[in-house]
Amino acid sequence: QDCPLDPGRFLQGLKESAVKKGAQFRYHCVVQEVGDGTVLLEGGEEGAGAEVIVAGGAWTDSMARSLKTRIPLQGGKGYSLTLNNPSTLPRLCSLLGEARVAITPMGDSLRVAGTMEICGNDLSINERRVQGIIKAACRMFPGLTPGEFEGVKRWSGLRPCSPDGLPYLGRVEGREKVLVASGHAML
């Protein structure tokens, strides 16, 4: 059974728990090299730990190249819009299979998301696809109107998609202290 959650809040809680246990996070930096228990960042900063987890989403393959390992992934772009205090707020999640749209209540907000566009690592917004998501949501939930979506921030993100649809989870061969966690696509 699917159940709603706020991904931002979930990840914040997960991060806080990991930091309490000694994990370190680095954002908006370029990984030059991943070694067995070490990471070299652009600019020379080096990090070391008991283990390194390579979880770079659609960019995991480029991060793992210094390990002499190929992790074939392709970015699958999806879009979402979040309405605060919408005119209609369903109590349950809905997956609109034919339209490939998900409707998710999150407290007093409603997240409307969908599509899968194989696009490399292009995060640009295709407004035609966004309008398709809005149209499907308004068709299935007549209380919603296209006007409610005017001025609402359009968001795009990349799902890391593996060729067979299965995630990469586990240790890198020959590297005792390096794990990969990526390729989860729509799981």
Language-model-derived ranges and their functions:
Residues 1, 7, 97-98, 138-187:
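C-terminal catalytic lobe of FAD-dependent flavoproteins
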Residues 66, 86-89, 107-111, 117-158, ...:
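Flavin-binding catalytic cores
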Residues 31-34, 101-104, 169:
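A structural signal for short hydrophobic beta-strand segments in well-ordered beta-sheet cores
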Residues 72, 121-128, 177-187:
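A conserved FAD-binding loop/helix module that cradles the flavin
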Residues 1-15, 58-59, 129-136, 183:
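Mid-domain beta-loop-alpha active-site segment that forms a flexible
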Residues 42-90, 126:
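Central helical "cap/lid" subdomain
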Residues 48, 93, 100-102, 168:
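Short, surface-exposed charged micro-motifs
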Residues 1-43, 47-50:
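Helical element adjacent to the flavin cofactor pocket in flavoenzyme catalytic cores
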